[in-house]
């Protein structure tokens, strides 16, 4: 019963993976336009989300995480990191700055810092909020953030389109590994969207089996002689450098202390939508 009341009493913070969320809004809705011909699909999705805060979920604090311009340590580690991202549709680019300016006008705080990606900002805020004993809701469906899911400390992802919580069970159901094992899993399978090389020839099933057997990437390589399948062993030996590089690339930095003055992140009480009308 005590733990029940503890959870009821817990303060909660909502962290939005802003670009990820806006991209998804854009592709989820038909290409809407205003009567002047300005594209509005992404902005409509964003407003629906803001209107749902308090209805779809309750939160005490809220923050919008953004990518900083320029490169990060990942580009220094690996020149090709995110090098082949497809071109972003013009309509989407037109709406992004408007959405960001609305976030600020509505009185929400933006988390951005040079050298950090939005995912690193999310990881940093989640870590500090967890240490404060908060419930942490990360608005994103991005698998790169699955490593942060932590049922024991009430850290989970929230898919705003499906209005669905993504917890440890959902992670295991989808990928066959726990959130704590997710970095090692990604290091093996790689990620074509971000140009993470992974181990060439190792797919999801093999990665799951290896992690189930050995737990971590380091442990896999320490026990390389115990791997029965000759082909898998060969692929791992050939891909060792890429595996460890990939692990560095997918590991989120969580050392950017951003919420020391937590009151700045209180959810505004007034109707924020009126501020942009």
For each predicted feature, which ranges?
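Domain-level signal for Mg2+-assisted phosphodiester chemistry and nucleotide/NA-binding surfaces
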Residues: 9-109, 162, 262
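Long, highly charged low-complexity segments
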Residues: 272-277
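Short, Lys/Arg-enriched N-terminal segments with co-localized hydrophobic residues
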Residues: 1-8
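C-terminal, charge/polar-rich interaction regions
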Residues: 212, 265-271
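Short alpha-helical segments and helix-capping/turn motifs at coil-helix boundaries
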Residues: 5, 46-52, 123-124, 234
């Amino acid at each position: 019963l005590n733990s029940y009341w503890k959870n009821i009493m817990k303060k909660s913070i909502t962290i939005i993976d802003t670009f990820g969320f806006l991209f998804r809004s854009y592709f989820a809705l038909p290409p809407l336009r205003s009567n002047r011909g300005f594209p509005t699909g992404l902005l409509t999705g964003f407003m629906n989300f803001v209107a749902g805060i308090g209805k779809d979920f309750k939160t005490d604090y809220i923050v919008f995480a953004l990518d900083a311009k320029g490169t990060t340590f990942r580009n220094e580690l690996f020149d090709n990191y995110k090098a082949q991202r497809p071109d972003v549709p013009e309509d989407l680019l037109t709406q992004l700055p408007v959405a960001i300016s609305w976030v600020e006008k509505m009185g929400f705080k933006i988390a951005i810092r040079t050298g950090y990606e939005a995912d690193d900002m999310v990881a940093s805020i989640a870590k500090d909020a967890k240490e404060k004993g908060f419930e942490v809701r990360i608005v994103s469906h991005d698998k790169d953030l699955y490593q942060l899911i932590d049922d024991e400390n009430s850290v989970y992802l929230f898919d705003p389109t499906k209005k669905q919580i993504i917890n440890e069970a959902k992670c295991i159901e989808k990928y066959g590994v726990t959130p704590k094992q997710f970095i090692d899993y990604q290091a093996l399978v790689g990620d074509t969207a971000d140009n993470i090389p992974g181990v060439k020839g190792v797919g999801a099933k093999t990665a799951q089996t290896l992690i189930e057997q050995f737990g971590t990437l380091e442990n896999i390589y320490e026990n390389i002689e115990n791997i029965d399948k000759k082909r898998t062993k060969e692929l791992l030996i050939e891909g060792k450098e890429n595996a460890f590089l990939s692990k560095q690339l997918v590991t989120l930095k969580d050392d950017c202390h951003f919420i020391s003055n937590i009151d700045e992140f209180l959810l505004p009480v007034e109707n924020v939508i009126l501020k942009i009308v």
